[in-house]
């Protein structure tokens, strides 16, 4: 289907498609953790007198069923897709994954209440020199909203604060890629505190050297 960081969202789409068309009544999306990722950045952490924090195996499971009229639904009519023609520039990828899907449904980027891209815990990635991955993604999404005329440049910090979230997931390979927010999104959707959430899965460019495109 798709690999690496693009795998979780692609798996959820496949599962939701089977449930929606009636091919399967109940579909479980299950993922194990990554042993090679344990203490992957420990050398950099130790150098900076930071405790080696990558000490847990991640896992994920989600049960997808046909629409029962009560549980929040996955919108299969407004899926994002990074096509070959979109190009490999970060702006092009962000547009394909976060601007075009709402547009297909007649919505703006500001109609999405929460965005869930790669949700790596910054307490782990910052000392390792990898930066704050979720924050960087949110700033890029906000900047695209400015370019599309949907928010003002001065509103970027507000957009990031309201529609983003701190990274809270261990660096367990594909596990942090958007899907850990689904449980929280279900609670928020049922409580009525949000109306829409977008789960974003994007693989790294270095994994797609044959096409020079991110997965």
What residue spans do the PLM features occupy?
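Small-side-chain structural scaffolding
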Residues: 7, 11, 15, 27, ...
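Short, well-ordered alpha-helical segments in soluble proteins
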Residues: 19-22, 31, 67, 105
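Flexible, glycine-rich active-site loops centered on histidine and acidic residues
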Residues: 24-57
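Claisen-condensing/thiolase-fold acyl-transfer catalytic domains that form or cleave C-C bonds
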Residues: 1-23, 91, 115-215
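Short acidic, gly/pro-rich beta-turn/loop elements at beta-sheet edges
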Residues: 39, 73, 209
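Short alpha-helical "patches" and their helix-cap loops
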Residues: 27-32, 77-78, 195-202
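Condensing-enzyme catalytic core mediating Claisen C-C bond formation in acyl metabolism
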Residues: 44-117, 123-126, 139-152, 156, ...
């Amino acid at each position: 289907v798709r690999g690496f960081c693009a795998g979780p969202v692609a798996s959820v789409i496949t599962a939701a498609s089977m449930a929606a068309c009636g091919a399967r009544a109940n579909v479980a999306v299950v993922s194990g953790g990554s042993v090679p990722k344990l203490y992957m950045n420990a050398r950099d952490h130790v150098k900076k007198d930071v405790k080696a924090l990558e000490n847990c195996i991640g896992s994920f499971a989600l049960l997808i069923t046909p629409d029962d009229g009560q549980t929040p639904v996955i919108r299969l009519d407004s899926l994002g897709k990074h096509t070959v023609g979109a190009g490999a520039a970060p702006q092009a990828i962000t547009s394909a994954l976060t601007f075009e899907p709402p547009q297909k449904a007649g919505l703006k980027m500001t109609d999405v209440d929460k965005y869930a891209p790669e949700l790596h815990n910054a307490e782990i990635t910052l000392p390792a020199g990898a930066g704050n991955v979720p924050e960087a993604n949110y700033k890029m999404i906000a900047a695209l909203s400015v370019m599309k005329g949907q928010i003002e440049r001065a509103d970027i910090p507000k957009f990031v604060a309201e529609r983003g979230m701190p990274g809270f997931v261990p660096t367990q390979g594909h596990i942090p890629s958007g899907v850990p927010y689904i449980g929280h999104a279900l609670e928020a959707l049922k409580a009525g505190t949000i109306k829409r959430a977008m789960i974003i899965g994007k693989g790294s460019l270095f994994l797609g050297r044959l096409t020079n495109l991110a997965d």
